[in-house]
Amino acid sequence: MISYENKEIEIKGCPGCAYAKHQFDVPCGIAYENERFILSQDWEVPILGFFIVSPKKHIEKLEELTKNERDEMFDIVDKTIKILRENNICDRFDIIFEEREDKHSHVWIIPRYAWMNEICDRIIKNIGTILDYAKKNFRTRDVYEQINQITKIVKKNFASKKYKKLIKINMFCKF
C-alpha cells in the first residue's frame, strides 16, 4: 500500500516492479523512461526535486546490475541533478542507493534544503526524520502541483538535444 495526497493505492507484490510495468499511474508523472530505468519524483515523500531512479528489472543489490546498467543509472542521476541546478530547484543533493532485502532497489536523489538542517544537524544520519517530516508537513495540493511542475521541467530537459547523449561518468566509491 502506498499513499499520495492522502489516497491509498493498493499494490500487489513488489511496488517497484508494479511501477516499472505501469500497473498504476505514477501520480507525479514520469520525468524520464527508457528500456531499463524510470525516473520520477517520489509521490509518497513530497519534497520538491526528490527523485527516484528505479531499474525496471527487479534487483535487490547493486551488483545485480551490469556495469553498463550501473553507468547508465548514474548518468540519469547526473543529468537529473544538472537539470535541477540549472532550473534553480536546488543546489545540493544527497544520493542514496537503497538496497533492502525483499525490496526493489533504487537510487534516491535527495535535494538539500535549509529546513532540513533545522530538523537535524546530520541529514544522512537522520534521513528517516526528514522523510517523515515531509510526509507530515508537505502533503498539500500546492506542493504536489509544484512537484508536477518540476517533473515537467526535468522531462522537457531530458528530451532536449543538450541531454540526449548520456554523459559518461564514474560515481562509484570503493569500500
Task: State the predicted function of each range.
Residues 1-175:
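HIT superfamily nucleotide-processing domains
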